C-alpha cells in the first residue's frame, strides 16, 4: 500500500493547523508521509509533478492518496481528513 502524501510549508499558517490533525492520524496508525515543499526544492518539484489535472490544488496544504489518486486541497478538519484517508 502506498503512502498518503501531505504536502505543506513550514511557515504556512493553514498547514500548521492541518499538521496537528495529520500527527494525530499518524499516531492512530494512518499511513501519511509529510512532505515539506517551501524549503525543499526537490519536494516542491515532486508536488508540482503530482498536482495536475482537474483536481489541481496549486498550493499547500495538499493531500494526495497515491492508491486512489484522490486529493484534498486546503485546510481540512481532522474528521474530513480521516474519512477521506479511510475511503469514506
Question: Predicted segments — roles?
Answer:
Residues 1-33:
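Local sequence-structure signature of Cys/Sec-based thiol-disulfide redox active-site neighborhoods
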Residues 12-15, 57, 73:
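Disulfide-bonded cysteines in secreted/extracellular proteins and peptides
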Residues 13-14, 41-42, 79:
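Short alpha-helical
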Residues 16-20, 45, 76:
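Generic recognition of short, well-ordered alpha-helical segments
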Residues 34-38:
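Residue-level recognition of beta-strand->loop/alpha-helix junctions
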Residues 40-50:
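N-terminal beta-loop-helix "entrance" segment that forms/cooperates
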Residues 48-64:
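Structural micro-motif
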Residues 59, 64-88:
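Non-catalytic, surface beta->alpha helical segment in thiol-disulfide oxidoreductase systems
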